[in-house]
A protein has these predicted regions:
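Nucleotide/phosphate-binding catalytic cleft detector across ATP-hydrolyzing
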Residues: 1-22, 28-149, 159-315, 323-397
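Conserved Rossmann-like nucleotide-cofactor binding loop
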Residues: 23, 154
Length: 397
């Protein structure tokens, strides 16, 4: 998928942000003035091998030239292609670096900000799956305090920022799963069996088959709210991505066939699955909200805070600033292809009433006034980490 300005200027070098995931490769391109001109997302089944990534990188390096600098973040190091996450980080960077040639490559390294390729040894653990922190750092430059909610195809990130700096409870994936800042649920790739072992539908509580028969993409396709081009991987059965095929897959999860009930019944079932997923996200959002309301300021050297305001200066941040007052409503910066679930939480009263939602893609005036393309802003929100690392690197210069 690609969303770009009508006439990108290929005579001046670009800043390119990369988010190398386990299932998708996302890219954001800024022009010489730091304005966003393109956001692209490609399916990349990294668990199948690095040969899924290398040709794609070569294509994009040739497509977007000249390039002034690369900003790289990732989460793909966790796929089971690699023996461990450290090996994954090393393999991905060893794949990327030769293709970049002489163009500078800066890698996002958590609280260290950006590090060049020759300074990365020993920092692999901080590079691993730090893409969410880049998104939060960019959001924190726009608001003194708030919450980032990024609902993606596979996972959901929920974390707060205060005093213009992210203040995560945890950093690594294992700890983030405990803190609920990482919720392993998304709107296309999550197997329905991961949402519940039993569900209540049509007056009966019934078991759910522990089989990869259907995913959340089927639920939102049945409900008619799955964004265009959101589902870039094969369906659970390798079949068609039609509404009828999704109904059949969803029915199979509870031992039924799609022809056994009418359309309204299947919509009801899809809404059951949606409610279960929203409840998971809502619980995490509530917990992180309480963290924000009770958190000390990030500059107080709280052991769980990452003082990124010192790495990426912001007009709001100051090492001597007083603790921020949590004004209401709280900015809720929404990102990811599943932003429609966040809006659903707001509209259906299942979320606290003291939030105001802000689309990630409009932050920082990255889109030129002459290019106010809502589709570009949409894709900037979908691919938040790629946009964030590009913007952070450009503005740090």
């Amino acid at each position: 998928m690609q969303r770009s300005s009508p006439q990108p200027d290929f005579s001046s070098p670009f800043t390119v942000g990369w988010d190398i995931g386990g299932a998708h490769l996302k890219i954001a391109v800024l022009d010489q003035n730091g304005k966003l001109i393109v956001v692209e997302q490609y399916p990349c089944a990294l668990w199948k091998g690095l040969d899924q990534l290398t040709p794609l990188l070569k294509h994009l390096f040739n497509k977007w030239t000249p390039i002034a600098q690369h900003a790289v973040t990732m989460s793909g190091e966790m796929v089971d292609l690699f023996t461990d996450r450290i090996a994954g980080v090393q393999a991905l960077l060893h794949t990327f670096a030769p293709l970049a040639g002489e163009v500078p490559v800066q890698v996002f390294c958590a609280n260290h900000g950006f590090l060049s390729l020759n300074a990365l040894e020993g920092h692999e653990a901080e590079i691993a799956s730090a893409n969410w922190l880049a998104s939060a750092a960019w959001a924190a430059q726009q608001f003194e305090h708030g919450i980032l909610l990024d609902i993606g195809s596979t996972t959901t990130d929920v974390l707060c920022f205060d005093s213009s700096s992210p203040i995560p409870i945890a950093i690594g994936d294992a700890d983030r799963l405990i803190s609920e800042e990482l919720v392993y649920t998304g709107v296309t790739r999550t197997p329905l069996m991961a949402l519940a072992q039993r569900i209540t539908w049509r007056g009966a509580t019934r078991g759910v088959m522990a089989e990869l028969f259907a995913t959340t993409a089927d639920v939102y396709r049945v409900l008619g709210i799955l964004p265009e081009d959101a589902d870039q991987h094969d369906a659970a059965d390798g079949g068609k991505k039609t509404r009828a095929a999704s109904i059949a897959r969803m029915a199979r999860m509870i031992g039924l066939d799609g022809h056994e009930y009418d359309d309204a019944a299947w919509v009801d079932l899809a809404e059951v699955w949606q409610a279960l997923q929203q409840a998971q996200i809502q619980a995490a959002l509530h917990r992180v909200q309480q963290r924000l309301l009770t958190a000390p300021p990030a500059f107080d050297n709280d052991s769980s805070a990452y003082p990124l305001h010192s790495v990426f200066p912001s007009k709001q941040a100051s090492a001597s600033a007083p603790p921020s007052k949590k004004s209401r409503p709280i900015p809720l910066v929404i990102a990811g292809v599943g932003r429609f679930l966040a809006r659903g939480l707001m509209h259906h009263g299942s979320a606290p009433t003291d939030f105001i939602t802000v689309e990630f893609g409009v932050l920082g005036n990255l889109i030129h006034p002459d290019n106010q393309n809502p589709v570009l802003a949409d894709y900037a929100s979908r691919c938040a980490p790629a946009v964030a690392v590009a913007a952070l690197l450009f503005r740090a210069q």
